Design a protein with these regions (language model features):
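Terminal accessory carbohydrate-recognition/targeting modules of carbohydrate-active enzymes
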Residues: 1-244
Length: 244
């Protein structure tokens, strides 16, 4: 495995711009992909967790843009694991203080976070020939269970679509047991989501709107300010050597 692993370690103070320049990419063999920056900040309109390869006339379609990740430590702070940029130069980068390592294992991205005696690893995997993405969190070390909150943020749009154009109609959330579907009108397939883990649940908060600024698009003179919609947030608990 060591021969197929590339590591980037982050000792001491970090250069914020470095987190925003370095990018990762995972593909599914259909033309679909997931991509982003090491910080989790979407700097390009093409960054997202699921850009699906759909039949014509849709083609590549942005289906799952962003995941806002909060880690709550027992009796301690709540740390945001991903960065966000809502307006020009308004970058939230708490993750820069807790990301200890980023590596590629067999070409797949792995983030290693360390905070207050807790070590957590995150992986992104796309099954071959499926428009599916798995985001996995594993508690490597820590004496007590930790709570993780995961807020999906979406904007269904064509791959080359403008980020500022709102959806033609409101999103609809359908819940069937522990499965969740977001429907964005007749032009798109539903986005199906599921959280597996201890005490996994979804808390609805009536649809939160998140501003997002795409800095690379702004530099290139393209449409660069948009919004993402979220139905609520998933939550679950992680114990040592367990996954969500």
């Amino acid at each position: 495995m060591s021969e197929m692993t590339r590591r980037i370690e982050w000792p001491g103070k970090h250069d914020t711009e470095d987190f925003l320049r370095k990018e990762w990419l995972v593909t599914n063999g259909l033309g679909g992909y997931a991509s982003g920056t090491l910080a989790g900040v979407a700097t390009r309109r093409f960054h997202g967790l699921l850009i699906a390869a759909l039949p014509a006339p849709l083609g590549r379609t942005m289906m799952f843009n962003h995941l806002i990740e909060l880690l709550s430590l027992p009796g301690g702070p709540t740390v945001q694991l991903c960065g966000e940029e809502s307006r020009p130069d308004e970058v939230a980068m708490a993750c820069a203080d807790v990301l200890a390592e980023f590596r590629l294992e067999m070409g797949l991205p792995v983030w290693r976070y360390e905070v207050a005696g807790v070590t957590l690893e995150k992986r992104v995997v796309m099954p071959h020939l499926q428009n599916t993405v798995h985001v996995n969190y594993r508690l490597i070390s820590g004496r007590e269970p930790v709570r993780i909150e995961l807020r999906p943020a979406i904007h269904f749009r064509p791959h080359e679509g403008l980020v500022s154009v709102p959806p033609p109609e409101p999103y609809t959330l359908v819940i069937v047991e522990d499965r969740y579907e977001i429907i964005g009108g007749p032009d798109y397939p539903p986005l199906r989501m599921r959280l597996l883990g201890e005490s996994a649940s979804l808390t609805l908060d009536r649809g939160v709107i998140k501003d997002i600024f795409y800095r690379v698009e702004a530099r290139r003179g393209y449409d660069s300010q948009g919004v993402l919609w979220s139905p609520g947030y998933f939550s679950g608990y992680l114990r040592p050597d367990s996954d969500v």
